Amino acid sequence: MSSSGAKGGRGKAKSTKSVSRSQKAGLQFPVGRIARFLKAGKYAERVGAGAPVYLAAVLEYLAAEVLELAGNAARDNKKNRIVPRHIQLAVRNDEELSKLLGAVTIANGGVLPNIHQVLLPKKSGKDKGEIGSASQEF
């Protein structure tokens, strides 16, 4: 048996293209870069093989969630481009994201429109007979 380039079935064939860990995991975020940051950051003495993959997946999910909501906010405002205001509206109107990013300030995000209930005019029209909405039937 003469196999070209292989030694008894071991090793990779020479024409095999390298596949990144992000591609293996089906992610867009860079697993290798996150692994490098985890090692350089001295968060722990050693970093497991699955930790950067898991962290990349979590970060990708959070980014996709925020972008989805910000895109909806931009579309509601009839805009094609997501600006920091749309991200602010998306994060603050979502209960879980607002809790997660509660202490985060988004630059140029503005504030949520909110008028306190005490400052709103009282609806006293129903107590007294409403003149404008009276029925036309006799």
Curated annotation (Swiss-Prot):
InterPro entries: Histone-fold, Histone_H2A, Histone_H2A/H2B/H3, Histone_H2A_C, Histone_H2A_CS. SUPFAM superfamilies: Histone-fold. GO terms for molecular function: DNA binding; protein heterodimerization activity; structural constituent of chromatin. Its main location: nucleus. The keyword Phosphoprotein applies. A motif ([ST]-Q motif) lies at residues 135-136. GO terms for cellular component: nucleosome; nucleus. Residues 1-24 are annotated as: Disordered. Keywords: Chromosome, DNA-binding, Nucleosome core, Nucleus, Phosphoprotein. It holds the Pfam family Histone_H2A_C. It is found in: Nucleus; Chromosome. Phosphorylated on Ser-135 (to form gamma-H2AX) in response to DNA double strand breaks (DSBs) generated by exogenous genotoxic agents and by stalled replication forks, and may also occur during meiotic recombination events. Phosphorylation can extend up to several thousand nucleosomes from the actual site of the DSB and may mark the surrounding chromatin for recruitment of proteins required for DNA damage signaling and repair. Widespread phosphorylation may also serve to amplify the damage signal or aid repair of persistent lesions. The keyword Repressor does not apply. Expressed preferentially in meristematic tissues. SMART domains: H2A (SM00414). Gene3D superfamilies: Histone, subunit A (1.10.20.10). The modification Phosphoserine is found at residue 135. Belongs to the histone H2A family. Variant histone H2A which replaces conventional H2A in a subset of nucleosomes. Nucleosomes wrap and compact DNA into chromatin, limiting DNA accessibility to the cellular machineries which require DNA as a template. Histones thereby play a central role in transcription regulation, DNA repair, DNA replication and chromosomal stability. DNA accessibility is regulated via a complex set of post-translational modifications of histones, also called histone code, and nucleosome remodeling. The [ST]-Q motif constitutes a recognition sequence for kinases from the PI3/PI4-kinase family. The nucleosome is a histone octamer containing two molecules each of H2A, H2B, H3 and H4 assembled in one H3-H4 heterotetramer and two H2A-H2B heterodimers. The octamer wraps approximately 147 bp of DNA. Interacts with numerous proteins required for DNA damage signaling and repair when phosphorylated on Ser-135. This is Histone H2AX. It comes from Picea abies.
